[in-house]
């Protein structure tokens, strides 16, 4: 439920109505950045309905969604999120590419140059790696962040990397332009609050078995903590199907674009687990309304330290970028 106050209210009158709402056992949630004086109300719908005819109230909007700050109900325009010089959202369609794991300085320099040459807009790479097996490569940590940052700086690409532990936040903040919260940490609420307390953009990936409402509530944690620079990412969910690594839920993109003002990316690499499926699913993501892609690219996928099977070669990535630009032009989207 939302309450919209009359525009001519003075601060004293506004404080008075807010106090009345609180006395009715309604939590009043501020919604900054709107053209109107609007607040989300959490609590009894019956109690909220009593304020529909209040002299200070212009409108009561009935919406029972549990997420408030990320909802589109009072925020009809798409939010724009800046990752360094790169703007995500609106009519632009962006592509962020890079290896699953940061391996060597030479690897990162090579792939950054190739992503730049193909027209990619950002560089991704994992310095801290959540792996299913404790014996798998776990990432280089701070050394990996330095390799990633150096490559991005040299080729003018803003960089994105995953955060797994709040104690690593100072290191990441010093080297990246955006944080990524992976599927396994989507409901790590202490981590969500930690990234919400700083001003770096956050790419929040959907959990393996998370509903879309749970994804939006996870985003709400970040925004409620003070950081409204949130980008959602559909990266596939776990189903009964075993032909692909996950099932890429493109329904989710259209649904999210209808329910939230936050930008939505798609990760077809994790969504399918198969490099040959990445190009068609990337084009489908563009067609269905996504704001961009996260794609794994490796100079030699057969030698990748992790997730080589789902990584594109630089040549495949370049072809895909050309195809995406052609499709974007047809459907009225813009690729920077």
Segments and roles (model prediction):
Residues 6, 140, 156-165, 177-189, ...:
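Catalytic beta/alpha-barrel core
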Residues 65-96, 322, 329-336:
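N-terminal amphipathic alpha-helix/helix-capping segment at the start of soluble metabolic enzymes
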Residues 72-77, 133-147, 166-168, 183-199, ...:
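Active-site-adjacent beta->alpha loops and helix N-cap segments on the catalytic face
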Residues 81-100, 127-134, 257-266:
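N-terminal small/glycine-rich loop or linker at the start of catalytic domains
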Residues 83, 193, 198-297:
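Catalytic alpha/beta core domains of metabolic enzymes, predominantly
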Residues 93-110, 133-139, 158-162, 182-183, ...:
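Active-site mouth loops of central-metabolism enzymes
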Residues 124-142, 299-309:
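Glycine-rich, proline-tolerant flexible connector loops at the mouths of alpha/beta enzymes
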Residues 137-161, 195-201, 250-264, 310-333:
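Alpha-helix-loop-beta-strand connector modules within alpha/beta enzyme cores
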């Amino acid at each position: 439920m939302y309450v919209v106050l009359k525009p001519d209210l003075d601060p004293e009158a506004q404080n008075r109505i807010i106090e009345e709402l609180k006395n009715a056992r309604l939590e009043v949630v501020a919604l900054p950045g709107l053209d109107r004086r609007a607040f989300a109300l959490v609590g009894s719908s019956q109690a909220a309905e009593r304020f529909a005819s209040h002299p200070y109230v212009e409108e009561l909007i009935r919406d029972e969604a549990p997420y408030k700050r990320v909802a589109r109900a009072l925020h009809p325009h798409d939010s724009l999120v800046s990752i360094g010089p790169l703007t995500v959202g609106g009519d632009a369609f962006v592509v962020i590419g890079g290896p699953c794991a940061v391996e060597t300085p030479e690897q990162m320099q090579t792939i950054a140059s190739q992503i730049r040459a193909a027209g990619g807009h950002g560089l991704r790479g994992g310095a801290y790696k959540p792996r299913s097996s404790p014996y798998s490569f776990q990432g280089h940590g701070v050394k990996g962040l330095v390799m990633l940052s150096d490559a991005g700086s040299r080729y003018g690409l803003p960089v994105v990397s995953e955060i797994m532990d709040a104690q690593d936040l100072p290191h990441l903040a010093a080297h990246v332009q955006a944080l990524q919260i992976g599927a396994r940490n989507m409901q790590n609420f202490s981590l969500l609050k930690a990234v919400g307390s700083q001003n770096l953009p956050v790419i929040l990936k959907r959990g393996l078995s998370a509903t879309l409402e749970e994804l939006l509530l996870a985003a709400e944690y970040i925004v409620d903590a003070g950081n409204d620079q949130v980008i959602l990412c559909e990266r596939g969910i776990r189903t009964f199907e075993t032909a692909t690594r996950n099932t890429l839920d493109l329904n989710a993109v259209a649904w999210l674009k209808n329910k939230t003002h936050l930008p939505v990316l798609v990760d077809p690499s994790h969504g399918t687990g198969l490099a040959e499926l990445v190009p068609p699913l990337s084009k489908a993501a563009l067609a269905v309304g996504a704001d961009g892609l996260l794609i794994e690219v490796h100079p030699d996928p057969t030698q990748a330290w992790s997730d080589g099977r789902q990584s594109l070669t630089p040549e495949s990535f370049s072809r895909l970028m050309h195809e995406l630009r052609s499709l974007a032009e047809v459907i009225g989207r813009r690729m920077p």
